[in-house]
Amino acid sequence: MQPPLLVLSVYLLWLKYCDSAPTWKETDATDGNLKSLPEVGEADVEGEVKKALIGIKQMKIMMERREEEHAKLMKALKKCKEEKQEAQKLMNEVQERLEEEEKLCQASSIGSWDGCRPCLESNCIRFYTACQPGWSSVKSMMKQFLKKIYRFLSSQSEDVKDPPAIEQLTKEDLQVVHIENLFSQLAVDAKSLFNMSFYIFKQMQHEFDQAFQLYFMSDVDLMEPYPPALSKEITKKEELGQRWGIPNVFQLFHNFSLSVYGRVQQIIMKTLNAIEDSWEPHKELDQRGMTSEMLPEQNGEMCEEFVKNLSGCLKFRKRCQKCHNYLSEECPDVPELHIEFLEALKLVNVSNQQYDQIVQMTQYHLEDTIYLMEKMQEQFGWVSQLASHNPVTEDIFNSTKAVPKIHGGDSSKQDEIMVDSSSILPSSNFTVQNPPEEGAESSSTIYYIVAKVLQHFKGHFKTW
């Protein structure tokens, strides 16, 4: 018998003397009735060690699979970070071009803007867009246009939103480094635990059947014929690619050609043309009748005011034409660059969000792996601690004492057994209670006490 098995079997020999007689002097009289106790104990010890070694092997296999998943996540993080940096670079380039164009436009076209603004802010435009059927969205678009154009050309305009701070990227990088360090240490601990358990396996190899030896020494990628008794949560298999698809962020956005400013230019010209076509001086029409037909009831008062100011509105045509020319000729690049900047900023935000999501998935994967490894180690890791003990020899049997507790001088009432284990475990002793309504020499009592001793021994070595 190999040393690790002897370490456990020594307890069983204690029980041999404890249960075989009421007192130590009467051992010879009853020893023959309990010769099966060490044999039962050895069989149970072998079964427990075998079960624990199976769990350690399964733990190693699971950790290797988790390492593959972790490597995929780290690869996705690296790719996403590169894409995020590309998006940031693109936004910075567009922002630089936009700032240059804005400076040139501000310096050269202040006068043109002063002539354009009255057209856009005039009551004629507001009245017409509120009264003419089919133009309900023009008013909001005009407000949006005014807000954006003031932002470009007014000296009091708000600054463009700054790109994400470098400090934020640094925090994210530190978090990823922390995750990588923790996972690497977890992998090292799992490998070390398996190595110590493998040492125990080699010492007890001849005690195991051939099938178990082939399984424990087989490649981890082969089918496991001895799966440990674990919960469904631990044994559940999920492919990383099925849970977490990592799209390419540069496929999310394209075609920057759509511009709100082009639509506003068209609205201005259509409005001017509609005013001119509808209110020709030589046309003799019943203006009130036309108004009642073409204008909505809820805007009746506003539309009547529009009719009264018709002559004044026609005078604004030249100014609005100048405004149209200004938008299309004097600062043609500013609106388009602004749209490109907004799209680039959106791309940066999406890439940052995606990067954060992958970081969160990696963090969850780490925490889930730690949880699974702790549960498996708690159940099976005790067997690896046998490797840290010196070889057990026959002399250790003589250095251990087990004393039955006798109540009231009645030797038949041995309900407790005190075991002195100071030569093996740091704790000096522990107590095993006999099961109620069972005799000291019954088979059920033997199995019960063996199980209690094994439970005490395994509990002592549950560390990590």
Swiss-Prot record:
This is Clusterin-like protein 1. The lineage of its organism: Eukaryota, Metazoa, Chordata, Craniata, Vertebrata. Pfam families: Clusterin. It comes from Mus musculus. Belongs to the clusterin family. One of its GO terms (molecular function) is misfolded protein binding. Disulfide bonds join 105-331, 116-323, 119-320, 124-313, 131-303. Glycans are attached at residues 195, 255, 309, 349, 398, 429. Residues 56-109 form a coiled coil.
